[in-house]
A protein has these predicted regions:
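Short coil/linker segments at helix-helix boundaries
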Residues: 1-10, 34-120, 139-157, 200-207, ...
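Residues within HEAT/ARM-like alpha-solenoid scaffolds
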Residues: 2-6, 20-24, 48-59, 120-131, ...
Length: 394
């Protein structure tokens, strides 16, 4: 957090020197969004603080886009005029006199100082548009967890803001096919979390939520030759859909089962992509472990889904395998420890199913190399996520 605050101070200083500098506007907004994400993950800081930072970031990004758009239009016009002048010169060009040559050489010697200014391109506009979608995604994520911190007008405001972004996509991407997937993924991630916020606030029903979520992730640019990143994002969205329905005490257990099964399929496909990054591969295993525990949770009341009951032992066994793989592949000590602890949990769930015994929390905690306090916090997180029943005594 200290490094982010130092970066923010530097960018804000640059912004004071030149309030209309597009780079300074963009960079300041990016750091504000990153700080907001850190605050959202910190239970000791009110989410309202994150909300303020994100609103400021959106204002800066909006201003940045407007300036970039204007500069691009100016650049295109200048290029057009320069081409016209060049064409006219070619028609009237004559060999320079000796005196003209001496003047040109003198000018060349005098004009040694110049400033290089990076031109604004369509890529610049795309970068800013994607950043805006990402900021809106973070904002909606916070609202799904703490809807009470914002007035009721917030979601309609976000929808209106995002509709302007969507309208811009065809204009700025028509000659940039290599950026279309990136734009579509940032939009799909945003749509998913906006729908989740709408569902939790009662403005969107489960059927609409699922239908529009699916539509966002099945666009040709995402579903055809999908990357590991797009498939992992789709799987995360499906898991979030399951969690949203679970939080609403929905009786749509079959819908949740199908969504989680689809998430596992997406993650399996992602893991088989040739050349997949090891960090992404580790993520596919960790998320498949989670998805299998979520599927197992459907066997418990009040869902009591028959397919989950029938396959409970296999689901917990699958989770154990995926968590162990994730622990081996993960690059950081913390990630390894989390996956390892979840693997132990899955093993004890298998014991519980086969022997009909209570879950041995003490044995799970003692298996952790990070200490009992850390292990208990991890188990509480698993309960909060719905990976373990809320009735579990910790």
């Amino acid at each position: 957090m200290d490094a982010l605050k130092a970066a923010l101070d530097a960018h804000q200083y640059a912004l004071k020197l030149d309030p209309d500098n597009a780079d300074a506007l963009f960079n300041t907004a990016q750091v504000l969004t990153s700080i907001a994400e850190e605050i959202a993950n910190d239970d000791d800081i009110p989410d309202k603080e994150a909300l303020k930072l994100l609103q400021e970031a959106l204002e800066l990004q909006s201003k940045c886009y407007s300036i970039q758009e204007l500069k691009l239009e100016e650049s295109i016009e200048q290029e057009r005029q320069a081409n016209e002048q060049a064409a006219n010169l070619e028609e009237t060009e004559t060999a320079p006199t000796e005196e003209q040559q001496r003047d040109q050489e003198s000018d060349a010697e005098e004009d040694q100082w110049f400033t290089v200014v990076e031109p604004v391109t369509r890529d610049s506009l795309i970068d800013t548009l994607v950043a805006q979608f990402n900021t809106l995604t973070t904002l909606c994520s916070i609202l799904t967890d703490a809807p009470e911190i914002a007035p009721p007008s917030t979601l309609p405001m976000i929808e209106e803001y995002s509709s302007r972004l969507v309208q811009r996509i065809p204009v700025i991407s028509h000659d940039k096919p290599e950026r279309v997937q990136e734009i579509s993924l940032s939009k799909a991630n945003f749509v998913s979390v906006l729908l989740e916020a709408g569902f939790k606030s009662g403005k969107v029903d489960a059927v609409t939520y699922k239908r529009e979520r699916d539509a966002a992730f099945t666009l040709p640019e995402l579903s055809t030759n999908g990357t590991a990143e797009t498939q992992i994002a789709n799987a995360r969205s499906l898991v979030s859909f399951n969690s949203a329905l679970a939080d609403a005490y929905s009786n749509d257990s079959a819908v949740r089962w199908n969504a989680l099964t689809e998430a596992v399929q997406q993650l399996t496909a992602a893991s088989k992509i040739q050349g997949i990054d090891q960090a992404e591969l580790a993520t596919t295993h960790l998320l498949r472990g989670d998805a299998n525990l979520f599927l197992y949770a459907l066997a418990l009341p009040p869902a009591s889904h028959q397919a989950a009951i029938t396959n409970a032992a296999q689901l917990t066994k699958n989770a154990d395998v995926f968590y162990r793989n994730a622990s081996k592949l993960s690059g950081t000590r913390e990630e390894k420890a989390i996956a390892s602890l979840r693997s132990v949990v899955a093993q004890h769930l298998q014991q519980q199913i086969s022997q009909g015994t209570a879950l041995d929390i003490g044995a799970i905690v003692s298996a952790s190399t990070n200490g009992p306090q850390w292990a208990l916090e991890q188990l509480e997180d698993m309960m909060a996520e719905g990976l373990l029943p809320q009735s579990l005594a910790i």
